[in-house]
Amino acid sequence: MNLKQKWDVYSRLTRLDRPIGTLLLMWPCLMALMLAAGGMPDLKVLIIFIIGVVIMRACGCIINDYADRDLDSFVERTKSRPLASGEISTKEALILFVVLGLSAFGLVLLLNGLVVKLSVVGIILTIIYPFTKRITNMPQMFLGVVWSWSIPMAYAAQTGEVPMEAWWLFAANWFWTVAYDTMYAMVDRDDDLKVGIKSTAILFGKYDRQIIGLFQIAALVCFIAAGWSAERGLLYGLGLLTFVGFSTYQQMLIFGRERAPCFKAFLNNNWAGLALFVGLGADYLI
């Protein structure tokens, strides 16, 4: 395997070729940094978190594919992943995971002690998550915690503490993550039932759209509470209104429960997150 082929394998293993996950992680993290700083966060902290999100997203993908390597080959969407297809060995994948994980931890060591402690919890959660799909019907709810963990870390890095405002944002992102990852799980539901992978899409069954809607509403309420705590104004409100518009569109897409529209609904959440981020940023700038 030449260098170009190796890069292609690593890129697919870490999902660098599919940045949607990184973006969905990035928007709430950047919002947390802005809210914690009351506007523009410290440049050093901002750079560390941007790089850290990219690295930890890659780590999460590697450990997820490692855990699912014997099942992914039976799922249409995942059968061509490098570990499932045998393009890379488990040893090489785990070495890459360790290297990236240590790199992320090295960045965290440039910040305060509270962030370091929270980061240890974060890496443990990241490792545990992929295995929850075998023992619980609600792995998306665990993923919501994993994908929201950068929020208390961001507040800790910027202010040295984690106030109630941070937990409102944490709750908002948790509800939102469960909603959009259930849409994602709807894409694989038929294959998951065959191989024994558990998900909220399977758990919710025929009530999936309604429950996703409830989670979207709960996310909105918590985003409002976070903004209220930070005394945000009209432009943040416009961002929230746009978020509602995207959520409504997603409900339309998943109405028929077909694979392609459900995946499109999942991808659309990137724009919902961007709308929230832009609304918050504009509210501080103008």
Swiss-Prot record:
EC id: 2.5.1.39
A Pfam short name: UbiA
Location, primary (coarse class): membrane
Keywords of the record: Cell inner membrane, Cell membrane, Magnesium, Membrane, Transferase, Transmembrane, Transmembrane helix, Ubiquinone biosynthesis
Annotated InterPro entries: HB_polyprenyltransferase-like, Prenyltransferase, UbiA_prenyltransferase, UbiA_prenylTrfase_CS, UbiA_sf
Regions that span the bilayer: 21-40, 95-115, 142-162, 167-187, 211-231, 235-255, 266-286
One function term, GO molecular function aspect: 4-hydroxybenzoate polyprenyltransferase activity
Localization annotation: Cell inner membrane
Cross-referenced CDD domains: PT_UbiA_COQ2 (cd13959)
Membrane-related topology note: Multi-pass membrane protein
Catalytic activity: all-trans-octaprenyl diphosphate + 4-hydroxybenzoate = 4-hydroxy-3-(all-trans-octaprenyl)benzoate + diphosphate
GO CC annotation: plasma membrane
Necessary cofactors: Mg(2+)
Signal peptide: none
Pathway noted in the entry: Cofactor biosynthesis; ubiquinone biosynthesis
PROSITE patterns linked: UBIA
Matches recorded under Gene3D superfamilies: UbiA prenyltransferase
GO-annotated biological processes: ubiquinone biosynthetic process
Homology family: Belongs to the UbiA prenyltransferase family.
Function comment: Catalyzes the prenylation of para-hydroxybenzoate (PHB) with an all-trans polyprenyl group. Mediates the second step in the final reaction sequence of ubiquinone-8 (UQ-8) biosynthesis, which is the condensation of the polyisoprenoid side chain with PHB, generating the first membrane-bound Q intermediate 3-octaprenyl-4-hydroxybenzoate.
Annotated NCBIfam families: ubiA_proteo (TIGR01474)
The protein's name in its UniProt record: 4-hydroxybenzoate octaprenyltransferase
